[in-house]
UniProtKB/Swiss-Prot annotation:
This is 4-hydroxy-4-methyl-2-oxoglutarate aldolase/4-carboxy-4-hydroxy-2-oxoadipate aldolase. It is an enzyme of class 4 (lyase). It comes from the Bacteria. Homohexamer. Catalyzes the last step of the bacterial protocatechuate 4,5-cleavage pathway. The preferred substrates of the enzyme are 2-keto-4-hydroxy acids with a 4-carboxylate substitution. Catalyzes the conversion of 4-hydroxy-4-methyl-2-oxoglutarate (HMG) to pyruvate. Also catalyzes the conversion of 4-carboxy-4-hydroxy-2-oxoadipic acid (CHA) to pyruvate and oxaloacetate. The keyword Nuclease does not apply. The lineage of its organism: Bacteria, Pseudomonadati, Pseudomonadota, Gammaproteobacteria, Pseudomonadales.
Length: 238
């Protein structure tokens, strides 16, 4: 499938999606937990930032390749979206123009799309926040775009430095964005839920006053690294 990266003039109408209940569960677990649960893979660039705060979600990726400074394929992609999807967009060459604003967001909301992940710029951000339409973007930029050059819809793209296939699960929150392969959805969900349970146990122990030094059995390793304790700074003199 990677040989399809960068191809243009193609729209794939039918893609496979994971079960919505599993997607929603990944969204509740959050980016950090999911990223750790899949051995720290799939995390998009830290430059992909939310324009809003307090939103955590997941959805099936509808992928879009656009030309620099050209948002034509956004409009093409809207037709291919279903409720629960997340639109994932990448330019064929780096560009931070404002590809997306409130009108396209209105169209996507009408299709039940949950969010936009775009490796480029967006604008109308205050209106987008007022609408409750979630966006993670590389830039905020009022510079507009044209509608002239073909791209693709539902072919693999590289977004935020990660390969994203149509139908992969995208999890996004205040910490960033992580991608989960569609065929790894269930196994990742099991691992992430287990990790969340263990973290809750540790949280309760920490709240009760236990030290991370003891919970994580750090003392012997610290000693082996050469860490030593002295009662007073004067003990180091002479």
């Amino acid at each position: 499938m990677n040989t399809l990266i960068g191809k243009t003039g193609i729209v794939v109408r039918n893609i496979q999606r994971a079960e919505l209940d599993s997607i929603d569960a990944l969204g509740r677990l959050g980016v950090a937990t999911v990223h750790e649960a899949q051995n720290r893979k799939g995390l998009l660039s830290s430059k992909m930032r939310p324009i809003q705060q307090g939103t955590s979600l997941a959805g099936s990726a509808v992928t879009v390749l656009v030309a620099p400074g050209d948002n034509w394929m956004f409009h093409v992609a809207v037709e291919q979206c279903r409720p629960g999807d997340v639109l994932v967009v990448s330019p064929s060459s780096p560009c931070t123009d404002g590809y997306f604003g409130d009108l396209l967001a209105t169209s996507l909301q009408a299709r039940g799309v949950r969010a936009l992940i775009v490796d480029a710029g967006v604008r109308d951000t205050q209106t987008l926040r007022d609408m409750g339409f979630a966006v993670w973007a590389r830039a905020i930029n009022a510079q507009g775009t044209v509608k002239e050059t073909l791209g693709s819809v539902n072919l693999p793209v590289i977004c935020g430095g990660q390969l994203i296939n149509p139908g992969d699960i995208v999890v996004a929150d205040d910490d960033g964005v992580v991608v989960v392969r569609r065929d790894e959805c269930e196994s990742t969900l099991v691992a992430a839920a287990e990790r969340a349970g263990l973290e809750e146990e540790k949280r309760l122990r920490l709240a009760a006053g236990e030290l991370g030094l003891d919970i994580y059995k750090m003392r012997e390793r610290l000693e082996a690294k050469g860490l030593r304790y002295v009662d007073n700074i004067e003990d180091l003199e002479g």
